[in-house]
């Protein structure tokens, strides 16, 4: 211990730390271990989440590898929520708030025990961003190694399927378009194994973005769960984190800069990633002390082409195909051939720059990862729309909108909750030409900003995906497709313009112009605003009550702030 200068010396060095060492020895730590770096392993194993059900064994592998590399591993667990299982009922209100609990939990364990470095093992939707937020707070050497995606399902006729296929199947079944037996086949075959759901949904989007941010090793976002390659990545991450702990860096805030966030959004735009990545990456930026305006995303989208179309944008390509084609680094390498799209100098946990990493990659399938000369679209798969209906922005997954649709004008049909909207959709009230407005489902109003996968999937499954639009102050699943705008800010519960919309109002969605417009005169909107009454909070007690009182707007990542802030 004499030459040790690591952070954990605070809990293990000197005569006055004899009680601390005694407690550590009770866990199996030896005198020889006291001179080694203490490595926290934030796992997220939980039985009810298929993306996490295998993480106990995976975490043990990482723990063993850290010890082999010369570190002292301490594994701990966070909670996790499966958004698919929580979808469409009260449970979804707990999904986004779980991100804050995860961030707080990781911060608490790391700071309480003054650990030297951190390996994060996330996988699904809110776990990855929650751990990213914690990493920004504690700012000790950190590597992310996710649990990996599941393979796509295979139906009896050879077609591929995934979770979104089932959600859309529910809509088709409600219209008599598929039988009970066909729906049961989807249920049985679409999700064949453990791992994060197999499309470019929120979980895989965030795990891919970890690579682009520089916080994960190449392959993290795409190598399948339980594959030999995933295990090799875990061992490599363990070796590297011990090196970083001894060197004292690089640290997360050295890596996550505005330029690194640009790179992450550029990847997201090139892949048509989930709109949730906007919410989560803004939250990570906020925790890192970075002001990142939404307009910067639109500037990127204007010059970043859409190169890699993955489910739900196409039924034919899943994350496993992206991995076989070369993965995230191959996409970045292809994108780097267009000047002004990426920042190659950004640092990564490997010690190399991101440009050095993508230089080693190869695009092995130009049908899966298009060359920049032949993109799916010259501009990207993600956009932020502004206008009198969304003064602080609304997020749109352009890559999941039919390419034939560039503008949509329709009449509003308003619902003050997701449940009301589902009743209206399945009850036949929603017709071609409608813009479905689902409000009071934002961070405060929900509370918890629930995802709207059930209504969007029902609309698509019923064959209305090109004829009906949906806008909301809530969120969407990464699997949502169609003309769907979420994260409308300010939200209805805060008196945002979405609260003033009435049935029959004309709404125009202009995708190329990045405008969302309520075609109602300003003086009429002022009259409506004067008559508007702020509703009482839906929840006043417990975690959701505290969350609703402290959460900020979607345009700043829906992070929590104490009242004095």
Swiss-Prot record:
UniProt organism field: Symbiobacterium thermophilum (strain DSM 24528 / JCM 14929 / IAM 14863 / T)
Binding site for [2Fe-2S] cluster: 124, 197
Active site: 477
InterPro entries in the record: Dihydro-acid_dehy_C (IPR042096), DihydroxyA_deHydtase (IPR004404), DiOHA_6PGluconate_deHydtase_CS (IPR020558), ILV_EDD_C (IPR056740), ILV_EDD_N (IPR000581), IlvD/EDD_N (IPR037237)
Catalytic activity: (2R)-2,3-dihydroxy-3-methylbutanoate = 3-methyl-2-oxobutanoate + H2O; (2R,3R)-2,3-dihydroxy-3-methylpentanoate = (S)-3-methyl-2-oxopentanoate + H2O
Pathway assignment: Amino-acid biosynthesis; L-isoleucine biosynthesis; L-isoleucine from 2-oxobutanoate: step 3/4; Amino-acid biosynthesis; L-valine biosynthesis; L-valine from pyruvate: step 3/4
Protein name as catalogued: Dihydroxy-acid dehydratase
GO biological process assignments: isoleucine biosynthetic process; L-valine biosynthetic process
NCBIfam families given in the database record: ilvD (TIGR00110), PRK00911.1 (NF002068)
Record function comment: Functions in the biosynthesis of branched-chain amino acids. Catalyzes the dehydration of (2R,3R)-2,3-dihydroxy-3-methylpentanoate (2,3-dihydroxy-3-methylvalerate) into 2-oxo-3-methylpentanoate (2-oxo-3-methylvalerate) and of (2R)-2,3-dihydroxy-3-methylbutanoate (2,3-dihydroxyisovalerate) into 2-oxo-3-methylbutanoate (2-oxoisovalerate), the penultimate precursor to L-isoleucine and L-valine, respectively.
Cofactor: [2Fe-2S] cluster; Mg(2+)
Family in the record: Belongs to the IlvD/Edd family.
Key words of the record: 2Fe-2S, Amino-acid biosynthesis, Branched-chain amino acid biosynthesis, Iron, Iron-sulfur, Lyase, Magnesium, Metal-binding
Subunit structure: Homodimer.
Database matches in PANTHER family: D-XYLONATE DEHYDRATASE, D-XYLONATE DEHYDRATASE YAGF-RELATED
Pfam families per record: ILV_EDD_C (PF24877), ILVD_EDD_N (PF00920)
N6-carboxylysine sites (modified residues): 126
Enzyme Commission code(s) on record: 4.2.1.9
Keyword Iron-sulfur tagged: yes
GO cellular component terms given for this protein: cytosol
Ligand binding (Mg(2+)): 83, 125-126, 451
Cofactor note: Binds 1 [2Fe-2S] cluster per subunit. This cluster acts as a Lewis acid cofactor.
One GO MF term: magnesium ion binding
């Amino acid at each position: 211990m004499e030459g040790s200068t690591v952070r954990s010396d605070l809990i293990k060095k000197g005569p006055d730390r004899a009680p601390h060492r005694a407690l550590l020895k009770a866990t199996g730590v030896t005198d020889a271990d006291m001179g080694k770096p203490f490595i926290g392993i934030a796992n997220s194993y939980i039985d009810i989440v298929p993306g996490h059900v295998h993480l106990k064994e995976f975490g043990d592998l990482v723990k063993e590898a850290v010890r082999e590399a010369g570190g002292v591993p301490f594994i701990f667990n966070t909670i996790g929520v499966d958004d698919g299982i929580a979808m469409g009922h009260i449970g979804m209100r707990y999904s986004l708030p779980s991100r804050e609990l995860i961030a707080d939990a990781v911060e608490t364990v790391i700071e309480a025990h003054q650990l030297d470095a951190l390996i994060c093992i996330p996988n699904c939707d809110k776990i990855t961003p929650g751990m990213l937020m914690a990493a920004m707070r504690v700012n000790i050497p950190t590597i992310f190694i996710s649990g990996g995606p599941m393979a796509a399902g295979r139906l009896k006729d050879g077609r591929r399927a995934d979770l979104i296929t089932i959600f859309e199947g529910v809509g088709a079944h409600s219209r008599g378009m598929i039988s009970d037996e066909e729906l049961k086949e989807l249920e049985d075959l679409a999700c064949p194994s453990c791992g994060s759901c197999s499309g470019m949904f929120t979980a895989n989007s965030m795990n891919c973005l970890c690579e682009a941010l520089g916080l994960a090793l190449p392959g993290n976002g795409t190598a399948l769960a339980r594959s030999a390659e995933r295990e090799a990545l875990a061992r490599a991450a363990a070796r590297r984190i011990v090196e970083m702990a001894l060197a004292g860096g690089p640290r997360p805030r050295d890596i996550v800069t505005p330029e690194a966030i640009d790179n992450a959004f550029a990847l997201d735009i090139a892949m048509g990633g989930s709109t949730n990545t906007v919410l989560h990456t803004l939250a990570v930026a906020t925790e890192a002390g970075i002001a990142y305006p939404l307009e910067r995303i639109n500037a990127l989208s204007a010059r970043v082409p859409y190169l890699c179309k993955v489910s739900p944008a196409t039924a034919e390509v899943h994350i496993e195909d992206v991995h076989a084609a070369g993965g995230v680094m191959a996409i970045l390498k292809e994108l780097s051939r267009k000047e002004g799209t990426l920042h190659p100098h950004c640092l990564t946990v490997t010690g190399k720059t991101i440009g050095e990493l993508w230089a080693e990659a190869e695009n092995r399938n130009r049908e899966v990862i298009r060359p920049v000369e032949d993109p799916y679209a010259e501009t990207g798969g993600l956009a932020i729309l502004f206008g009198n209906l969304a003064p602080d922005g609304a997020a749109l997954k352009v890559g999941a909108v039919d390419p034939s649709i560039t503008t949509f004008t329709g009449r509003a049909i308003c619902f003050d909750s997701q449940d009301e909207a589902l009743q209206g959709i399945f009850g036949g009230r929603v017709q071609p030409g409608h813009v479905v407005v689902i409000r009071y489902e934002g961070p405060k109003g929900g509370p918890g900003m629930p995802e709207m996968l059930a209504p969007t999937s029902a609309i698509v499954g019923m064959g209305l995906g090109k004829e009906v639009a949906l806008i909301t102050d809530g969120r969407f699943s990464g699997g949502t497709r169609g003309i769907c705008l979420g994260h409308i800010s300010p939200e209805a519960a805060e008196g945002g313009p979405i609260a003033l919309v009435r049935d029959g109002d004309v709404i125009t969605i202009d995708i190329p112009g990045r405008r969302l417009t309520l075609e109602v005169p300003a003086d009429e909107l002022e009259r409506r605003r004067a008559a508007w009454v702020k509703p009482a909070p839906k929840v006043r007690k417990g975690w959701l009550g505290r969350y609703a009182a402290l959460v900020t707007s979607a345009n700043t990542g829906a992070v929590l702030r104490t009242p004095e802030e």
